[in-house]
Structures are given as structure tokens and as C-alpha cells.
């Protein structure tokens, strides 16, 4: 099915209108059968159709357009804004999140960790750190009244 033309309808009316062919063309089968058996309602209906054809074609095309229109669905997505500084909602069952700037807490039952991670790295070529009380390599020997060292001298 497609839209119908007024010119084609007038041509069908002129040559075959007494048999109602123009009515069948415009999907009006009941009046087409009536015209077929009465010779266009005794020529009177055939003559009146000269004025009715433009309206019949317009009605047919309007029905055709309304049946073949595509429907467009518009979907709107609403997003909840997240403001800086406000806590975000955690999913169900997730542990609570620490506020920014607070030191992380240990999970329940976990061994304690260093508060700030690994010790800082020494620069390349620097001697390794010594335990407390031991003089660094190359330092002067202590002087003064210290107890004598153990063992032979």
C-alpha cells in the first residue's frame, strides 16, 4: 500500500467510474460493489464523484500516513549529582569508607602495620643505617673514661 494520486483516481473515474474502479482504488470496496452493480448509481453518483475525488484521496492518504508513522520513544536518564565534600553512599555490605585525610584503620583482627608505610629510601651510595649506639663507619673512637673493652688487646 502506498499513497494514492488524484490524477490516477480521475483517470480511473473517467474510463471505469461507472464500474466503481476508482472506489476500489481508494480502498472503498462497499461503495465500489454498489457502483459495479448499479452503473455508478444510475450515472448520478458517477457524476457527483467528480467533486468528491480530491477529498476521498486526501482521506485515504491521511489514514495511510497515520498507520505508517513510526513512534519515537524518548528516554530521560536522571543522574543524582555528587557534591564535593559529601559522603558517597556505599553499596550494601561494604565496609564504611574513611573520611579524607584520616589514617586508614586496620581490619578487625589484623596485625598492626607501620603507620605511614615503608621507611624512606636512602640515596644511592649512602651507607646503610646503623643501629642505635654503634658509631658510623669512619667515626673517631670514643675518648674518655669508658670501661675497657672485653678480650685481649
From Swiss-Prot:
Superkingdom in the source lineage: Eukaryota
Limits of the TM2 domain: 3-50
Gene Ontology CC: one annotated term: membrane
Segments traversing the membrane: 6-26, 33-53
Main location: membrane
Biological source species: Dictyostelium discoideum
Swiss-Prot/TrEMBL keywords: Membrane, Repeat, Transmembrane, Transmembrane helix
Subcellular location: Membrane
Region (6 X 8 AA tandem repeat of Q-Q-P-Y-G-A-P-P): 89-136
Disulfide bond entries: none
Region (Disordered): 85-153
Pfam family name, one: TM2
Name this polypeptide is given: TM2 domain-containing protein DDB_G0277895
Renumbered ranges of Sequence repeats: 89-96, 97-104, 105-112, 113-120, 121-128, 129-136
Similarity-based family: Belongs to the TM2 family.
Ranges annotated as biased composition (Pro residues): 93-153
Amino acid at each position: 500500500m502506498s499513497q494514492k494520486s488524484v490524477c490516477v483516481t480521475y483517470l480511473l473515474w473517467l474510463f471505469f467510474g461507472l464500474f466503481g474502479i476508482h472506489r476500489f482504488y481508494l480502498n472503498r470496496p462497499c461503495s465500489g460493489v454498489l457502483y459495479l452493480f448499479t452503473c455508478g448509481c444510475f450515472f448520478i453518483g458517477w457524476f457527483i464523484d467528480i467533486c468528491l475525488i480530491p477529498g476521498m484521496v486526501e482521506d485515504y492518504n491521511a489514514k495511510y500516513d497515520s498507520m505508517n508513522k513510526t513512534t519515537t520513544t524518548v528516554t530521560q536518564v536522571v543522574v543524582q549529582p555528587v557534591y564535593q565534600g559529601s559522603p558517597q553512599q556505599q553499596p550494601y555490605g561494604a565496609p564504611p569508607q574513611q573520611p579524607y585525610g584520616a589514617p586508614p584503620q586496620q581490619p578487625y583482627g589484623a596485625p598492626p602495620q607501620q603507620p605511614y608505610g615503608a621507611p624512606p629510601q636512602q640515596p644511592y651510595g649512602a651507607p646503610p643505617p646503623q643501629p642505635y649506639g654503634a658509631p658510623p663507619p669512619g667515626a673517631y673512637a670514643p675518648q674518655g673514661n669508658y670501661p675497657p673493652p672485653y678480650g685481649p688487646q
